[in-house]
């Protein structure tokens, strides 16, 4: 494709964008549906602190398609855009830009100053977002945007929190949660699941000495830094453990029996002492590894606990427990009254209790700790292990699990409501419902919602010195209790507000909400519910539709579900489309640093937004699978789908204007069979599109477009060209124009939600004076049942299948399509052969074959060969496969032909019989000399390849027509221009020209031919003969 094509595509789309804006078409689509049923849509809010990428464009396209379709299908579809303004993404940008990276730096800079800096950069890339949203062809209402940092939004978040609190679903507690030491704050469990990486970590087995010199317990860990906080060991009471003596060291070890070969593979290296049960070990004491917390022994530390979660598939069957740094450890130690110590600060550095490593980052201390254990003869094994480990989704630093005091939403209390809500949600693809999302709900944990950060919605809890709580649910309530006017709810406006009540002083707790709490409250907060627009909010809840990426099954989809189920015992949305991830072409994550992908702007400038949209919509990424992005794939959509459609429109316009066709004057025209077929295909496609859209299956909706455009351009128009070119104003010509006009108009409306630019371009060139101003103001078409003719579609499908089969034979055996052949034999069921007999001439034209023979039996020129399909049959019959192979080899042609018709056969193996079907058999053909054969799903084609002199001469004539018309196109001649030709060619080509002169002149609009004896003009190879032409336009 040349640059001119690319420029025209981009320029044409820009022109359409201008038309939409100048005529305010989006607003008119809303006005047009005022009073119609509302289709409610929630838009997942992005952060404007980063530029949009392909993932955003993909999700935006999906949302746009569904909303456009709903609007055209008779719904009022408001599309408010929203911005996620709070949280770590914004804070992190400000910290980097201001160099506030040291602990306490933000406090020294001032929380008020810091938050105002955050406010300044929130919309850093808002203009870029608006550009890309517009350029991809997405319609949203930027004039009514909602923002999570707005006073009204934050007040509704307070109302949500207060409502949860009133239901007893909020509590304060200490739990082990994912913790980002880079941010100094806990994360939710679903945030921790968003960024796992394969990493190499230490792998150590440590020797814990039982009291009274009774040997050592061996425990394995990949986090040596937690060993300084060891408070207990755990065994499975039902597992069998062993005591052995290491011959080299003389030490006695206890470990799980099944893990023994893992750590002592050489049976001669140890002496067996005996077995003991896990239960017998429970309660025994051991010596602390480190001296830092040995005083905790009096409080119940350094004992062996029972734990039924222990497995012997890895490790030693004995688990080291640091209750401050492992959830299972925490609960086990809590149950058995083992104390908790947490000598790690919020930056991940050891505190003063661990005097030998104080101030050192815990992950950096792994080597020093292992070295010390080795020096003290407490290290049994040291190595590395490769495993998946969670990293902070924002800072890309390793997370730890840490016991922190936090505020929680009691998700586990409403788990049954969440599971019930999920049952009523329609998921696309469907497996997400009970798979990734359903399983996540089943394992849902209480949600740690408090963050010790700065730029966010403050948690509205005021606490007195004696622990009494005031939970505020509105600005009015806070103003009444504090006596102050509230103009902003951010920390630096309300942290100093003190409430005095009943002789007590209450101050706000120093936390803000997890920003996912903001987005989960979006259905209510976007409308300032319940303070304003309550009726509107309730009428549009749950949303009819949402869409985001697969990662949001543990993000926004989840938080929406938690809050909606808890507050209203309902889902937050009825239908959801989940998309996959767009990767670079090499399969890696798209990376600006690696520069491994083309920019979206470059792609849209080069190939257009429609090509990008259709490329994405017709890929696996809309089925929640990963897509390796390819700019060649986008280019292919443009060249193979959109340009042929544009060419079809140009063809219609050219000849409709040439002959003055008026679409209003088409009543009572008798249609040809091919007209009825393309209309039937159109309305069948329309029915499939409507059905697919009702199921929110965009891939199924757009996939047939490609085949239909192929049917339209490469079959209907190509097969009907002579009808359009008919100089007489015949009924047949008017039928062709009428049919093509209807197809293009209806199809422009069908594709409008999916590829809005080309559909608008088509519609504008076709619409009448009284038609709606834009294709997007039209109703989505309805199926015209009387125009759907299934038998005709099947018949044409059979013809196309046969033609494709014949062409594949020609290609395989290097027989040019322009070279006529004498015979083709089509073999199929008698019923189908009889139905196709009347279209033999059509098949002959397409295959360039003189005589088409329809047969229910394979002709004598071909022998059908069958043998077992070893891949499928081997699984069924095993070692009897050779017997079946011999039996098939001996079958007569009559039985083989019967199998070809029925698709089944019974093979005798001695006294036993085995039934075989088509998938068990591989079919091939042995052809007589001069014949070739091939099969499709329904037919066998046998092609007679023998060339006679008349066939050779006609083949040369057809090649001449092709080359002359190529020169016409290259010379920019109009379709109606007449030409004169000067020809230099060998005798055989001159003879072919003379023999088929009338045909050649008619096909090329040639009025005269002069044979010259010298080379002039462009030279061509015509079936092995060098020929040159000069073309000159002849004035009429």
UniProtKB/Swiss-Prot annotation:
One of its GO terms (molecular function) is zinc ion binding. GO terms for biological process: isoleucyl-tRNA aminoacylation. It is found in: Cytoplasm. One of its GO terms (cellular component) is cytoplasm. Its main location: cytoplasm. A motif ('KMSKS' region) lies at residues 589-593. Pfam families: Anticodon_1 (PF08264), DUF5915 (PF19302), tRNA-synt_1 (PF00133). SUPFAM superfamilies: Anticodon-binding domain of a subclass of class I aminoacyl-tRNA synthetases, Nucleotidylyl transferase, ValRS/IleRS/LeuRS editing domain. It catalyses: tRNA(Ile) + L-isoleucine + ATP = L-isoleucyl-tRNA(Ile) + AMP + diphosphate. The keyword Ribosomal protein does not apply. ATP binds at residue 592. Keywords: Aminoacyl-tRNA synthetase, ATP-binding, Cytoplasm, Ligase, Metal-binding, Nucleotide-binding, Protein biosynthesis, Zinc. A motif ('HIGH' region) lies at residues 46-56. Its EC number is 6.1.1.5. Its cofactor is Zn(2+). IleRS has two distinct active sites: one for aminoacylation and one for editing. The misactivated valine is translocated from the active site to the editing site, which sterically excludes the correctly activated isoleucine. The single editing site contains two valyl binding pockets, one specific for each substrate (Val-AMP or Val-tRNA(Ile)). Belongs to the class-I aminoacyl-tRNA synthetase family. IleS type 2 subfamily. HAMAP family: Ile_tRNA_synth_type2. Monomer. Catalyzes the attachment of isoleucine to tRNA(Ile). As IleRS can inadvertently accommodate and process structurally similar amino acids such as valine, to avoid such errors it has two additional distinct tRNA(Ile)-dependent editing activities. One activity is designated as 'pretransfer' editing and involves the hydrolysis of activated Val-AMP. The other activity is designated 'posttransfer' editing and involves deacylation of mischarged Val-tRNA(Ile). This is Isoleucine--tRNA ligase. It comes from Chlamydia trachomatis serovar L2 (strain ATCC VR-902B / DSM 19102 / 434/Bu). The gene is ileS.
């Amino acid at each position: 494709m040349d640059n001119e094509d690319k420029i025209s595509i981009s320029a044409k789309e820009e022109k359409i964008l201008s038309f939409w804006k100048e005529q305010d078409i989006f607003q008119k689509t809303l006005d047009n549906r005022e009073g119609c049923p509302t289709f409610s849509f929630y838009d997942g809010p992005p952060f404007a602190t980063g530029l949009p990428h392909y993932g955003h464009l993909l999700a935006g396209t999906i949302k746009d398609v569904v909303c456009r379709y709903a609007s055209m299908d008779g719904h009022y579809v408001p599309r408010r855009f929203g911005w996620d303004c709070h949280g770590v993404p914004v804070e992190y940008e400000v910290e980097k830009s201001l160099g506030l990276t040291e602990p306490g730096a933000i406090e020294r800079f001032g929380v008020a100053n810091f938050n105002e800096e955050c406010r300044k950069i929130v919309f850093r890339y808002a203009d870029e977002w608006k550009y890309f949203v517009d350029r991809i062809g997405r319609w949203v209402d930027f004039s009514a945007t909602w923002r999570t940092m707005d006073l009204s939004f934050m007040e509704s978040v307070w109302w949500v929190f207060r409502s949860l609190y009133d239901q007893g679903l909020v509590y304060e507690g200490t739990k082990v949660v994912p913790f980002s030491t880079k941010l100094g704050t806990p994360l939710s469990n679903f945030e921790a699941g968003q960024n796992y990486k394969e990493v190499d970590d230490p792998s150590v087995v440590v020797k814990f000495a039982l009291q009274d010199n009774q040997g050592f317990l061996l425990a394995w860990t990949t986090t040596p830094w937690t060993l300084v906080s060891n408070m207990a060991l755990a065994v499975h009471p039902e597992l069998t453990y062993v005591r052995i003596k290491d011959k080299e060291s003389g030490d006695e070890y206890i470990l799980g029996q099944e893990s023994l070969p893992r750590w002592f593979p050489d049976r001669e290296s140890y002496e067996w002492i005996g077995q003991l049960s896990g239960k017998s070990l429970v309660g025994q004491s051991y010596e602390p590894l480190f001296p830092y917390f040995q005083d905790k022994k009096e409080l119940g530390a350094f004992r062996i606990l029972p734990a039924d979660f222990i497995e012997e598939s890895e490790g030693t069957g004995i688990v080291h427990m640091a209750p401050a740094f492992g959830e299972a450890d925490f609960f086990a130690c809590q149950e058995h009254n083992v104390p908790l110590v947490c000598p790690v600060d919020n930056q991940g550095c050891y505190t003063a209790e661990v005097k030998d490593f104080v101030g050192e980052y815990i992950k950096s201390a792994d080597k020093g700790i292992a070295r010390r254990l080795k020096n003290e003869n407490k290290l049994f094994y040291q190595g590395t292990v490769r495993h998946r480990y969670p990293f902070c989704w924002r800072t890309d630093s390793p997370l730890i699990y840490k016991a922190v005091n936090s505020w929680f939403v009691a998700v586990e209390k409403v788990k049954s409501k969440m599971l019930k809500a999920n049952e009523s949600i329609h998921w696309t693809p469907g497996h997400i419902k009970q798979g990734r999302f359903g399983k996540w709900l089943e394992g849902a944990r209480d949600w740690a919602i408090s963050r010790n950060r700065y730029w966010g919605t403050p948690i509205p809890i005021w606490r007195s010195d004696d622990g009494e709580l005031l939970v505020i649910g509105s600005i009015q309530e806070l103003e009444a209790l504090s006596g102050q006017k509230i103009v902003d709810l951010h920390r630096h406006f309300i942290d100093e507000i003190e409430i005095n009540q009943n002789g007590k002083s209450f101050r706000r707790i120093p936390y803000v909400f997890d920003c996912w709490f903001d987005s989960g409250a979006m259905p209510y907060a976007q409308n300032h519910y319940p303070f304003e627009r309550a009726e509107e909010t309730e009428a549009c809840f749950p949303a009819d539709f949402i869409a985001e990426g697969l990662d949001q099954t543990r993000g926004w989809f989840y938080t929406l579900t938690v809050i909606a189920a808890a507050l209203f015992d309902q889902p937050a949305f009825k239908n959801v489309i989940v998309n996959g991830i767009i990767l670079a072409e090499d399969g890696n994550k798209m990376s600006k640093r690696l520069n491994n992908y083309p920019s979206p702007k470059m792609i849209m400038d080069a190939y257009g937004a429609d090509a990008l949209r259709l490329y994405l919509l017709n890929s696996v990424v809309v089925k929640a699978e990963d897509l390796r992005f390819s700019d060649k794939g986008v280019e292919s959509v443009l060249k193979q789908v959109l340009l042929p459609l544009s060419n079809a429109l140009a063809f219609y316009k050219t000849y409709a204007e040439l002959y003055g066709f008026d679409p209003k004057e088409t009543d009572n025209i008798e249609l040809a069979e091919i007209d009825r077929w393309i209309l039937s295909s159109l309305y069948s496609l329309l029915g499939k599109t409507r059905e697919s859209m009702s199921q929110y299956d965009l891939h199924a909706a757009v996939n047939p477009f490609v085949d239909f455009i192929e049917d339209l351009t490469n079959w209907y128009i190509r097969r009907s060209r002579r009808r359009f070119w008919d100089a007489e104003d015949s009924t047949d010509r008017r039928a062709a124009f009428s049919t093509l006009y209807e197809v293009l108009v209806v199809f422009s409306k069908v594709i409008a939600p999916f590829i809005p630019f080309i559909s608008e371009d088509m519609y504008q060139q076709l619409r009448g004076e009284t038609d709606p101003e834009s294709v997007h103001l039209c109703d989505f078409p309805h199926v015209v049942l009387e125009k759907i003719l299934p038998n005709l579609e099947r018949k044409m499908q059979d013809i196309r299948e046969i033609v494709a089969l014949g062409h594949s034979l020609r290609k395989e055996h290097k027989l040019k399509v322009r070279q006529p052949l004498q015979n083709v034999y089509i073999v199929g069921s008698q019923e189908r052969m009889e139905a196709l007999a009347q279209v033999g001439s059509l098949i002959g034209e397409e295959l360039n074959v003189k005589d088409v023979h329809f047969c229910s039996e394979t002709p004598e020129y071909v022998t059908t060969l069958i043998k077992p399909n070893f891949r499928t049959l081997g699984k069924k019959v095993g070692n009897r496969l050779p017997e079946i192979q011999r039996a098939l080899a001996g079958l007569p042609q009559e039985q083989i032909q019967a199998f070809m018709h029925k698709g089944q056969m019974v093979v005798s193996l001695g006294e036993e019989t085995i039934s075989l079907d088509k998938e068990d058999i591989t079919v091939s053909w042995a052809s007589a000399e001069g014949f070739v054969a091939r099969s499709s799903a329904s037919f066998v084609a046998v092609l007679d390849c023998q060339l006679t002199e008349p066939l050779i001469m006609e083949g040369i004539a057809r090649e001449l027509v092709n080359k002359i018309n190529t020169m016409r196109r290259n010379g920019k001649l109009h379709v109606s221009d007449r030409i004169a030709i000067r020809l230099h060619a060998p005798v055989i080509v001159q003879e072919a020209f003379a023999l088929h002169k009338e045909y050649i002149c008619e096909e090329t609009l040639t009025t005269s031919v002069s044979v010259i004896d010298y080379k002039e003009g462009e030279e061509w190879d015509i079936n092995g003969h060098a020929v040159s032409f000069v073309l000159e336009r002849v004035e009429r």
